[in-house]
Amino acid sequence: MTDRPHHRPSGRPRRPSAKARPPGGARFVRPPLSIQVTTLWDYPSQDYGDGRQGIPGYKGATPSYIIWNLLQRYTKEKELVVDCFAGSGTTLDVARDLNRKALGYDVHPARKDIFRVDARKLPPELTGKVDFVFIDPPYGTHLDYGDDPRDIGKLDLADGTAYYDAMDQVFGEIHRVLRPGGHMALYVSDSYEHRSGKGAFHAVGFELFARMRKYFEPVDIISVTRHNKTLEMGNYRKAAEEGNYFLRGFNYLFILRK
């Protein structure tokens, strides 16, 4: 059964406090947030402050400082922020921390304040009313979030243009709901897959950027340092060296304007 989307963001779920401790037992203290001023972004934690944003342990969650920086730059208080691949709700939590209105959609809603909606068919009543859209879409069939056949992440990157065509529809919907002068941001990485002893590189970022340019004016391109634990695991690094391929050390953050 499909939840009915509406324009009243529901109350903020209670978020657990941070308990992260580095080796040695000393409590890790997250540094204060600040506006990133170069095109290389880095922050040593998934979350900021003393609490958590989104659901702890959710696979593929967006680092919350990225959304914080975007909303500080491109939105004002009371403006409407939408995330149509809302995942664990990180965008919703950050937006509410900053006194922005927020709506989250996903075909696999993980919280009650996220509505079960396909990003290719956003609610018609949103047309021209959204100030900012953030998306961190699934790609490459790396993660399985559920059985909904509308899940774009189930489209294989190696299977022609199906994934990119689906994302093109998403970009068209984002263009429809954004107000003139509104901004969107896409957070994504390229992909390298092993198939039957062979490797396949997929330039996901460039492919999606080319599609977005049909609808939007580019503002800037950011490289975001990845802090995935596997990047430091010896077996992963050894396999990359012996297999003559590269581990993904950064994500793209494409910022565009309607």
Stretches found by the model and what they are:
Residues 1-258:
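Class I S-adenosyl-L-methionine-dependent methyltransferase catalytic core
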